[in-house]
Amino acid sequence: ECSSAASDVYKRQILPNKVIVADSIDSNSSTTKNIDSVSGSDKIFDINLTSNMSEILKNSKTILWNGPIGVFEKEPFQKGTHQLAKTIAGSEAFSLAGGGETIAAINKFINKDEVSYCSTGGGAFLEYMEGKLLPSIEALGG
């Protein structure tokens, strides 16, 4: 039953309708574009979290977050990750966050205690969530 429900979740892809583009990562100016207007030469540095995305997160029972959705270290490109962090913090879901950049974003935008579980491990965190046995855990007898 669980794998059937999980399969249904994986079939659904929610994409942003607007993205933030700029000439370079060091640019102080940016432009918001509809996703359909993005050209091959545009450099996307952030996305706008849609109300649909926020609603799905707010109604989720579990949220797994791995990786920021924009270049959150730079002012014009941090809005998407900031919105994501605030939405997760405001959710009643059990939330898991993994990866050094994700934890840095959490520390920048919200209180770490607003996330149920944080791990600085990125790839290892995801592998563990997949049920893979990690060498370090195995060495400890786990």
Identify the meaning behind each predicted range.
Residues 11-76:
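Active-site rim loops that border cofactor/substrate pockets in soluble metabolic enzymes
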Residues 1-6, 10:
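Single conserved hydrophobic/aromatic residue that forms the stacking wall/gate
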Residues 77-86:
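Charged helix-capping and loop-helix junction motifs
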Residues 11, 90-94:
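A short helix->loop->beta-strand "cap" motif at the edges of active sites that frequently abuts
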Residues 100-142:
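C-terminal functional extensions of proteins
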